Amino acid sequence: MRFTRRRLLAGIGLAGLEAMMSPLAKEAGTFSSAARPAAEAGASTCPFRLAVINDEITQDFEKACQIVAEDFGLEWIELRSMWNKNVTELDAKQLDDARKILAAHKLRVTDIASPLFKTDWPGAPVSRQSERRDQFHADFDATAQDKLLERCISLAQTFETDRIRCFDFWRLDDPAPYRVAINAKLQQAARRCAKENLILLLENEMSCNTATGEESAAVLQAIPDKNFMLNWDPGNAAALGSTPYPDGYALLPKNRIGHCHCKDVIRKPDHKYKWAPVGGGIVDWVGQLQALHHDGFHYGLSLETHWRGAGTPEESTRISMDGLKKTLTRAGISC
């Protein structure tokens, strides 16, 4: 047998990650195409649209789709960037190529994971977060947001999904003076999406103005439009120091959760955070998944590991997906 880096990570090489991984994550192996029939059987009975954000694996879109479909046995994928370009900046040929690749692997798109409104709020003090510009090969200032929204609507139609992910501007030390105006902008965008029968998903993001369950609930209450929903990210909330489950989740209107991102996090003694494989951090994913299932959530449950402890995005995502599937099993959910 030829021992590759991936095989070593799936076996004894995982011991080197012990400092950051729980027993669940340490058990993680890798998926192979030989296991595809069993994986597909689980996918067909899964109550969620189990997915992965494509660029968490690789910028090679063909390879990412092959891994998602054949190795992970999934039917869904979330689109953010590929070929070192944000999905919102793909040209016509690249869009056509992407659609052909998706069709070849029989993958459906959960949503367009766009960078919409991940910028500074005009007129407010410049956010400390704005220097990071972590937008996955995209950088649109405030003046470009309306045009970006139209592009996202077009992409949703192209990829036959009804959901677009957005944010609510880089986090301010004191967003209160601007909150009403920010909400108005979000509502305006949601109503534009509604005209095309699309759902606008606000992600709670630690670098933006809505990060926790409490903040998410407040925005959802302020914007009652039914097609304005939450992309609930417990890992992001935990990174800011809150307890996403059960505390944050308890505050959320369950019928307004339209997507969920899966990642895990470790809080360090200096109160900073670092990412972990799913099941290897402080998020109570067993409880969270059970609650989502109990409350009738049946939309995208998408792995966005961010963790890179296995050396490469692909290897890290394989371990984190294995952790997610083991966590689903522990939660009594067949996927």
For the regions a language model picked out, list residue spans one by one.
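Glycine-rich, proline-tolerant flexible connector loops at the mouths of alpha/beta enzymes
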Residues: 80-98, 102, 171-173
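Vicinal oxygen chelate
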Residues: 83, 87, 131-132, 169, ...
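A non-catalytic, amphipathic alpha-helix used as a structural packing/dimerization or gating element
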Residues: 97, 101-104, 147-151, 184, ...
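Active-site acidic/histidine proton-transfer and metal-coordination neighborhood
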Residues: 13-20, 40-44, 66, 119-230, ...
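A cross-domain feature marking catalytic cores of carbohydrate-active enzymes
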Residues: 52-56, 79-83, 111-116, 166-168, ...
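Histidine-acidic metal/acid-base catalytic patches
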Residues: 2-23, 33-37, 43-51, 58-75, ...
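Glycine-rich, aromatic-flanked loop segments that form ligand/cofactor-binding clefts
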Residues: 106-122
